[in-house]
A protein has these predicted regions:
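Asp-based, Mg2+/Mn2+-dependent phosphohydrolase catalytic module
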Residues: 5-127
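Conserved phosphate-coupling serine/threonine residues in phosphotransfer and NTP-handling enzymes
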Residues: 1-2
Length: 127
């Protein structure tokens, strides 16, 4: 999301450090965010134009940012801590992994998650 630099990116870096996975920029093929590219060659999208729970952000990130054809959508997962994000992932045709700390449980969207994790290391074991 556009909150990448304020919230998501520091949490991603922290999780990678805690799990001993090194630099997340070296781990992923690309890091696609709403609004900003992390480094040259990566694609950012403007999720503010169609905010969650609209599926456009996830669908466009997979198609344009990662080059994944819609027919291959069953290979795509999304990790979210918000109910709107889970809905967005599901509406895009992807499998959502819910992550604790957001409003998934309170919002009643946990049942839409393919899996749910309380900790990042649990997500790693699902991949």
């Amino acid at each position: 999301t556009s909150g990448l630099y304020q919230k998501a990116w520091p949490e991603i870096v922290s999780a990678f450090q805690a799990l001993g996975l090194g630099d997340p920029k070296e781990f992923y093929d690309a890091i696609v965010t709403a609004g900003f590219a992390i480094r040259n060659g990566e694609v950012g999208t403007l999720g503010e134009l169609s905010p969650k729970p609209h599926p456009w952000l996830y669908a466009e990130a997979a198609r344009v940012g990662l080059g994944i054809d819609f027919t291959q959508r069953h290979y795509v997962i999304g990790i979210e801590d918000s109910g709107a994000g889970v809905c967005s992932i599901r509406l895009a045709g992807f499998a959502p992994i819910g992550f604790a700390g957001g409003n998934i449980n309170k919002g009643g969207t946990r049942a839409l998650c393919t899996h749910f994790a309380d900790r990042f290391d649990q997500i790693l074991s699902l991949l």
